[in-house]
């Protein structure tokens, strides 16, 4: 009876997203994968080959210009898109990098989808980084080659639970559970918040590491950098608890897996452009940046469809077209041009 009571007490104290076997799950009430889904790598790879790689001339800023803009803005607060979910975010004296991926492939070793657009600059050309944020362990976000060769291993690393083991040679590694926070310095605080996603890198490690969104608070402003996420009711709750948000970064690509999934343009774990706008509305976000597109083919929608739908749907969700922001790869924008 004593052991039973101890076990019951532990269960009562365990957060909902912590399972007894040590794995994690999405917030209560989140959507589940459709039981009619029939995933096939063979079919997916056949369909993926049909996706046309047609890149507009203005999609990418030349590398030399990117380096010039970064140098010119080294004393300003800015945001720069390196590609996919990799951004440089300069806030005061702190330079942040998000989900850095500089490899050619988004998979193990030399496997996985190849990016059709290289990073805006090379890894050895990035400015000194003070804060490294990692949202989850999927290969298009956690790139071990980049982590091993990262030139600023003294930077503070903040990541979800059980991901610290990948950063053995780093000096300041901090794992967070949902709703835990770290004060980075006098100006910046980072909180890990729930997302609707999952984790996996191998055959036997599904959901053994946590995933999450980052809320960055800086001089009275709130910036939310989203993990890959699907839509869920959790975002209304987060909007009520933490909103309004000044600026949200959110995935708008990698949503069409039909015919493996029963519904076209719908993914449980990746928002389509309209769902991304709905999440931003739920968060009471003033502005939103669409990311996770235009870099590598991870799904079957046309590669330039996400930004078009994102802009086209903005007003329906309460945003002006100017407040639904699309970057060019390599583009550098001053923060005060985006949020005041």
Pin down the residues of each PLM region.
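Metallo-beta-lactamase
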Residues: 2-125, 156-227, 246-252, 309-331, 335-339
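Active-site metal-binding motif and surrounding structural segment of the metallo-beta-lactamase
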Residues: 111-158, 243-249
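Acidic/histidine-rich helix-loop elements
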Residues: 102-119, 198-205, 256-270
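Divalent metal-coordination and catalytic microenvironments
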Residues: 89, 99, 136, 143, ...
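Cap/insert and terminal regions of metallo-dependent hydrolase folds
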Residues: 12, 17-19, 26, 126, ...
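Active-site metal-binding loops of divalent metal-dependent hydrolases
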Residues: 100-102, 137, 195-196, 227-229, ...
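A short acidic, amphipathic alpha-helical/loop segment
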Residues: 145-150, 169, 234-238
């Amino acid at each position: 009876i004593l052991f039973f009571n101890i076990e019951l007490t532990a269960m009562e104290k365990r957060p909902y997203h912590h399972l007894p076997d040590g794995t994690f799950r999405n917030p209560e009430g989140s959507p589940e994968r459709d039981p009619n889904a029939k995933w096939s790598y063979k079919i997916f790879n056949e369909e993926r080959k049909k996706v046309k790689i047609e890149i507009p001339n203005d999609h990418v800023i030349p590398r030399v210009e990117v380096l010039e803009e970064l140098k010119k803005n080294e004393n300003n607060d800015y945001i720069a898109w390196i590609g996919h979910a990799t951004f440089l975010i300069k806030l005061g004296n702190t330079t942040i990098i998000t989900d850095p991926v500089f490899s050619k492939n988004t998979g193990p070793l030399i496997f996985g989808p190849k990016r059709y657009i290289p990073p805006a600059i090379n890894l050895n050309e990035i400015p000194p980084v003070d804060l490294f944020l990692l949202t989850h362990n999927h290969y298009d976000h956690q790139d071990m080659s980049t982590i091993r060769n990262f030139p600023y291993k003294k930077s503070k690393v903040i990541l979800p639970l059980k991901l610290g083991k990948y950063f053995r040679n780093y000096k300041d590694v901090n794992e967070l559970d949902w709703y835990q926070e770290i004060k980075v310095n006098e100006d910046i605080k980072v909180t890990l918040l729930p997302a609707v996603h999952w984790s996996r890198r191998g055959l036997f490690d599904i959901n053994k590491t946590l995933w999450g969104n980052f809320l960055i608070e800086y001089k009275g402003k709130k910036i939310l950098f989203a993990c890959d996420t699907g839509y869920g009711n959790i975002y209304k709750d987060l909007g009520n608890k933490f909103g309004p948000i000044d600026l949200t970064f959110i995935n708008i690509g990698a949503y069409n897996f039909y015919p493996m999934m029963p519904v076209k343009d719908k993914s449980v774990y990746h928002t389509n452009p309209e769902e991304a706008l709905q999440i931003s509305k739920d968060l009471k976000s003033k502005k939103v940046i669409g990311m996770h597109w235009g870099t590598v083919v991870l799904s079957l929608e046309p590669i330039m469809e996400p930004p078009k739908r994102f802009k086209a749907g903005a007003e329906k969700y309460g945003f002006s077209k100017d407040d639904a922001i699309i970057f060019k790869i390599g583009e550098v924008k001053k923060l005060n041009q985006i949020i005041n």
